[in-house]
Amino acid sequence: MEHTDRSAWQQRTELLLGEEKMERLRRAHVLVVGLGGVGAYAAEMICRAGVGRMTIVDADTVQPSNINRQLPAVHSTLGRPKAEVLAERFRDINPELELTVMPVYLKDEAIPALLDSTQFDFVVDAIDTVAPKCYLIYHALQRGLKIVSSMGAGAKRDITQIRFVDLWETYHCGLSKAVRKRLQKMGMKRRLPVVFSTEQADPSAVILVDDEQNKKSTAGTVSYMPAVFGCYLAEYVIRKL
């Protein structure tokens, strides 16, 4: 098996997945919305697998509270847009990656236009607020797009209880419950693969807030839990492409 210098970094992946699968990954275009604790890890694992085109979306900047768990967050990146920090990493990982960077808050009315702007082979939903999350899910399913979604990783710590199920089979997850309720009101009851945890959330790890956009509470998190959720999402995308 011969490799050019540019493709040498993919040798181990090709050895496992095979040449045909690698070519499918190179041709694929994956949209990742939400680049926090879960989404950034999902996006990087997808990038490292050799996906050829990606669009990443997140308006947030790196904050001190992100450093305990988020991939783009270190002291030297404080105040910088997460999407831009990750774009630098991804282009350094794969210089041939065709990357579209959108450091914007994805408002509900902008979602249909984004999904119609090009042909996405997979959509990764790692949004942590209910309204835009549900609009993305709704419009992706309406268009017949492949989509996988992350439910809540906060206030939980046991990675052995992480599962992949259909959204309508989730339990012990406040975000899942809110998403189901909103989608039902929107008339959407199609199947949706999600990663969630069967672990009951620790109520003492949740506090009410009123200073964050579209958020009513903040949940305690630990370094590894969102990362594992993100890896679950990436594995699903890579397996299904």
Positions of PLM-derived features:
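N-terminal charged helix/coil linker that caps or initiates catalytic domains
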Residues: M1-V30, P64
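Conserved N-terminal Rossmann-fold NAD(P)-binding element of oxidoreductases
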Residues: V32-G34, V57
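Hydrophobic/small residue at the entry helix of a nucleotide-binding pocket
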Residues: V38
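Short amphipathic alpha-helix with an adjacent loop that forms part of the alpha/beta core around
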Residues: E109-F120
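Acidic/polar active-site rim loop that often engages polyanionic ligands
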Residues: P64-P72, A155-D166
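Glycine-rich phosphate/adenylate-binding loop
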Residues: E2-T4, T118-F122, T129-P132, Q142, ...
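Glycine-rich phosphate-binding loop and adjoining beta1-alpha1-beta2 segment
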Residues: V51, I56-N94
